[in-house]
A protein has these predicted regions:
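FNR/FR-type flavoprotein reductase catalytic core
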Residues: 84-220
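Local cysteine-cluster metal-coordination motifs and their immediate loop/turn environment
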Residues: 127, 194-195, 216-250
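Short, surface-exposed amphipathic charged segments that create phosphate/polyanion-binding patches used
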Residues: 173-177, 225-230, 259
Length: 261
């Protein structure tokens, strides 16, 4: 876990993926060396006030955005437009300034010589992309990704959509147990909506498979001060609230108290 630092960096390139998704690329070798898969940055458009479409919804807070890619100082943030904060970010172009606090949080543990299943849903895709690049040369990987529709789907090994517009129809966890058995999986990594993560955790608990999940939570400060992102972690008999921004966002799935959300 790093000590998050505040910086301003110019956007080098903006990549349009679809009507809903885009990537902002920055360049910083020091930040690149500090980042790890599963970590995130709190980011905000420096011109947030100007870019706000409604004066009553000015995006003052930073948005927690996971690291999508990180190679030699070239850092990417894959973002979905869902509210005023991300819409303000979507209006930035090359040369515009981005405010960053990070890298923050604890990332995924990295293993070698394992059979690994990655499972992601929706905007849970970006941290998995960075993770698979770190794992692929030393492990056997299989990646399942699910989304509501075709526009939520990106490159992976197995695709699931709620509406069946591409890949298999259903929820991504529907095929999880079969893949664990077929590919003799040792470890599962996951990131996505809370119901998906809870179901994935139920499956790995039943099959006694090691499982690390990345949780998403509303954040205010993003540096562990406000405790606004705390989630219940621990055993059923002895649990406590842990901060997603500090102790997380990655936790052992078996330690997350899903029933308390």
């Amino acid at each position: 876990m790093n000590n998050p630092q505040y910086r301003q960096r110019a956007i080098q390139y903006r990549e349009e993926l679809s009507d809903d998704y885009f990537i902002l690329w920055i360049w910083d070798e020091a930040l690149g060396a500090a980042g790890r898969p599963g970590q995130f940055y709190e980011i905000r458009a420096l011109a947030s006030l100007k870019n706000a479409s409604n004066v009553n919804k000015i995006p003052k807070l930073f948005k927690p955005i996971s690291i999508y890619d990180n190679q030699g100082g070239r850092i990417g943030f894959m973002i979905k437009k869902v509210g005023e904060g991300t819409i303000a970010l979507s209006k930035l172009r090359a040369g515009d300034m981005l405010e960053l606090i990070g890298p923050a949080g604890n990332g995924f543990p990295i293993y070698r010589g394992k059979r690994i299943l990655l499972i992601s849903g929706g905007i849970g895709y970006p941290p998995m992309w960075y993770l698979q690049k770190e794992l692929i040369n030393h492990n056997q990987l299989y990646w399942m990704h699910g989304g509501a529709k075709q526009g939520d789907i990106f490159p992976c090994d197995e695709i699931w959509t709620d509406d069946g517009s591409i890949g298999r129809k259903g929820r991504v966890c529907d095929g999880m147990a079969a893949n664990i058995s077929k590919n003799e999986i040792d470890i599962v990594y996951s990131c996505g909506p809370l119901p998906m993560l809870a179901e994935a955790s139920r499956i790995t608990n039943e099959l006694e498979i090691e499982h690390y999940c990345s949780l998403e939570s509303y954040m205010a400060c993003g540096i562990g001060v406000c405790h606004g992102c705390a989630v219940p972690i621990g055993s059923k008999e002895a649990w406590d609230y842990k901060r997603v921004c500090k102790e997380g966002p990655v936790f052992k799935a078996e330690e997350v108290r899903w029933e308390l959300f």
